[in-house]
């Protein structure tokens, strides 16, 4: 089947939503799905689709009770997604989310840069403040871990990707969205697995897992590890002390101990120890002609201890607590001839107790919690002339509550609120470029959500919620002619999010989820570059985004599942000069389609294709740095047998090499491109 790509349209001229060929095709699939499902309701042709349970909002809900725009990948879905071994493999499939590839830039969600107001050196000097939160088993990763670190999908129970502000429930650094990853817990029966994979670009994966009881039905453990290696597709020159920048490696090791004492009914506790490390080039942008590519190398490492408690006190109340302590470090190594090293060592701690109440008749569901977070990190920037010591300290205290009340049998009202107080310190000890920032700010983050369910399987709702990103300070510099650093401060950013959502389930085989949104920003933080080359973070007067996400799944038969998702987006902001522009990396349309097909005796075929519309690389909206629309297609064939599965897959099946981002506004050669096609295979054995 041929894929029809839209002709290139000037980004500057394409100022309106256009539901062109791709939209029409997808909407046709939606409506065609409804018609078929309603008229072909025979048990031998259809399979009842499972109901997804969402866990990332601190309360378990079905997808039909969840107002957030969220993509859910359980373990089975991850295994059946072509070539999915790390979180980036999933992010590239989500409409209204742009993941440009390996670089300083984290994904944008609904046009909002998940990296925060700055990336690279400016972010390092200012103290990073991302808008996208990524957590693994309750611990939120740092900016450098999200951008450069390991995010393995091995032995993951579920991954949830939230589009839109999550500040009211997740707290700091979630104004763009959140990625919640939950690994598998120990089991009270023995299970184990090993996996080996190989692929082009010298890719390899070696992974294993074992889970077993120690005391039957009381004490159990689980151990898992994953190592993935590959070579960068960009030709890079080796230098000391970094070695070969082409070599990319990530390692994850996790151990869990689960205790459910028989003498204490309803109580369970889990202790988790995990280590993650990675190394690779800071960016995989193509080489500029005539220059040797002495690309900086980033190495990250972290060790985390997490202790979780769940105690069902009685039929009404449940107490939970999550405690996390982590050590982390990351090091940037550069060519000594143009040295710009950066080293960080840090620690963080948080504790989050919760109390839940659920009425016996289910009419009231209440959550009350508190959170204390503190982190400290010591940084050092080292150039050819000197070293610049820096340090940062953050403390955040918050209390939050959520109440869901059944106003009538068909109307539910959800009220939530979070009060957060955050202290941020940033210090640079250099006598010429001294920075001493110490500010405390408070914010109240409310949410109101009203859902109407006239009949089972049909829900309509509206919600309003507030998000924020903390204030801060940093050191500005000149990108054209470096003459030193200049200290500056920027204010807190806030966002009001309004959404209308629907959830539909037809004949137990068709699912349609929609979210229409409008986001209004106050004092949006954005990197600004003056005509003279000065780079710093400033607060904008006006910014807004609006659009929609539409998703559908159709269990056409007991062996065939089809899905299609569409994202629409419009963004605008007013520069400090007064000019109105579009936000960078904010395509007006993005989409994906795919299928899962079981056939023969144990064979599975899965494929997907994702489309990303044209967008600008930078806030100036220059046509010179505009990105053409692009596709990526993936396919996988698996054979499932009694004790495992064997898989053959291809990512970027058509070997598309479109540009995804221009990293510099000084030239058009410094650009990221799609990773080339990779064909690989893996074998997993279960015992």
From Swiss-Prot:
Under PROSITE patterns, the record lists: TONB_DEPENDENT_REC_3
Which terms in the GO cellular component ontology are assigned?
cell outer membrane
Q: Which UniProt keywords apply?
A: Cell outer membrane, Ion transport, Iron, Iron transport, Membrane, Receptor, Signal, TonB box, Transmembrane, Transmembrane beta strand, Transport
Disulfide pairs here are: none
Per the entry, what induces it? Expression is up-regulated by low iron concentration condition. Iron-regulated expression is repressed by Fur.
Q: What happens when the gene is disrupted?
A: Cannot bind or utilize exogenous ferric vibriobactin.
Q: Which InterPro entries match?
A: Plug_dom, TonB-dep_rcpt-like, TonB-dep_rcpt_b-brl, TonB_rcpt_b-brl_sf, TonB_sidphr_rcpt
Instruction: Supply the Gene3D superfamilies for this chain.
Output: TonB-dependent receptor, beta-barrel domain
Q: Where does the record place the TBDR beta-barrel domain?
A: 189-687
* Annotated SUPFAM superfamilies: Porins (SSF56935)
Origin: domain of life? Bacteria
Q: Which GO MF terms are attached to this record?
A: high-affinity ferric iron transmembrane transporter activity; siderophore uptake transmembrane transporter activity; siderophore-iron transmembrane transporter activity; signaling receptor activity
Main location, first listed in the record: membrane
**What membrane topology term does the record carry?**
Multi-pass membrane protein
Q: Where in the cell is it found?
A: Cell outer membrane
Family assignment? Belongs to the TonB-dependent receptor family.
Report the protein's function. Involved in the uptake of iron in complex with vibriobactin, a catecholate siderophore synthesized by V.cholerae. Binds and transports ferric vibriobactin across the outer membrane. The energy source is provided by the inner membrane TonB system.
Q: What is this protein called?
A: Ferric vibriobactin receptor ViuA
Q: Which organism is it from?
A: Vibrio cholerae serotype O1 (strain ATCC 39541 / Classical Ogawa 395 / O395)
């Amino acid at each position: 089947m041929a894929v029809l790509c839209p002709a290139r349209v000037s980004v500057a001229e394409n100022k309106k939503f256009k539901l062109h060929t791709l939209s029409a095709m997808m909407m046709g699939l939606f409506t065609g799905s409804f018609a078929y499902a309603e008229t072909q309701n025979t048990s031998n042709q259809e399979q009842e689709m499972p109901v997804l349970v969402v866990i990332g909002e601190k309360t378990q809900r079905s997808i039909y009770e969840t107002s957030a725009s969220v993509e859910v990948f359980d373990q089975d879905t991850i295994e059946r997604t072509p070539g999915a071994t790390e979180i980036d493999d999933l992010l590239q499939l989500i409409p209204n989310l742009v993941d440009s590839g390996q670089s300083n830039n984290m994904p944008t969600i609904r046009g909002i840069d998940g990296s925060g107001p700055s990336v690279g050196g400016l972010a390092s000097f200012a103290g990073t403040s991302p808008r996208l939160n990524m957590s693994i088993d309750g611990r939120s990763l740092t900016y450098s871990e999200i951008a450069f670190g390991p995010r393995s999908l091995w032995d993951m129970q579920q991954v949830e990707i939230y589009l839109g502000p999550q500040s009211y429930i997740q707290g700091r650094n979630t104004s763009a969205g959140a990625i919640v990853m939950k690994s598998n817990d120990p089991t009270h029966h023995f299970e184990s697995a090993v996996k080996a994979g190989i692929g082009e670009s010298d890719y390899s994966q070696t992974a294993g897992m074992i889970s077993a009881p120690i005391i039957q039905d009381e004490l159990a453990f689980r151990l898992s590890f994953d190592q993935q290696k590959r070579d960068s597709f960009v030709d890079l020159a080796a230098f000391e002390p970094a070695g070969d920048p082409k070599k990319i490696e990530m390692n994850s090791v996790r151990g869990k101990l689960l205790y459910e004492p028989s003498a204490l009914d309803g109580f369970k506790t889990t202790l988790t120890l995990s280590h993650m490390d990675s190394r690779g080039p800071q960016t995989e942008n193509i080489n500029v002609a005539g220059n040797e590519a002495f690309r900086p190398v980033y190495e990250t490492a972290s060790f985390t201890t997490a202790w979780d408690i769940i105690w069902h006190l009685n039929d009404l109340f449940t107490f939970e607590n999550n405690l996390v302590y982590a050590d982390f470090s990351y090091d940037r190594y550069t060519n000594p001839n143009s040295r710009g090293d950066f080293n960080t060592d840090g620690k963080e701690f948080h504790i989050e107790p919760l109390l839940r109440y659920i009425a016996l008749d289910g009419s009231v569901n209440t959550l009350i919690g508190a959170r204390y977070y503190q982190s400290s990190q010591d940084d050092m920037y080292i150039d050819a002339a000197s070293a610049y010591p820096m340090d940062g300290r953050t403390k955040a205290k918050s209390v939050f509550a959520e109440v869901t009340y059944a106003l009538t049998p068909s109307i539910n009202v959800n009220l939530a609120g979070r009060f957060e107080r955050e202290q941020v310190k940033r210090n640079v000890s250099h006598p010429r470029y001294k920075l001493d920032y110490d500010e405390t700010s408070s914010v109240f983050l409310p949410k109101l959500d009203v859902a109407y369910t006239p009949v089972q399987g049909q829900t309509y709702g509206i919600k309003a919620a507030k998000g924020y990103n903390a204030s801060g300070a940093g050191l500005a510099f000149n990108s054209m002619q470096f003459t030193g650093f200049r200290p500056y401060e920027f204010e807190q950013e806030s966002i009001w999010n309004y959404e209308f959502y629907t959830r539909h389930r037809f004949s137990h085989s068709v699912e349609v989820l929609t979210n229409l949104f409008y986001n209004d920003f106050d004092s949006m933080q954005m990197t600004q570059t003056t005509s003279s080359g000065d780079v710093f973070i400033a607060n904008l007067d006006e910014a807004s985004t609006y659009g929609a996400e539409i998703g559908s799944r159709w269990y056409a038969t007991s062996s065939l599942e089809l899905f299609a998702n569409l994202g629409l987006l419009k963004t605008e902001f007013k520069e400090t000069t007064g000019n109105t522009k579009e936000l960078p990396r904010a395509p007006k349309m993005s989409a994906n389609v795919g299928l899962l097909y079981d056939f023969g005796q144990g064979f599975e075929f899965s494929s997907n294709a994702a489309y990303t519309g044209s967008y600008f690389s930078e806030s100036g909206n220059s046509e010179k740095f505009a990105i053409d629309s692009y596709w990526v297609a993936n396919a996988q064939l698996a054979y499932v047998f009694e004790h495992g599965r064997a898989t053959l897959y291809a990512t970027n099946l058509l070997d598309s090499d479109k540009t995804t981002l221009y990293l510099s506004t000084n030239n058009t050669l410094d650009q990221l491109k799609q990773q080339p096609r990779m064909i690989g295979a893996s074998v997993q054995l279960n015992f």
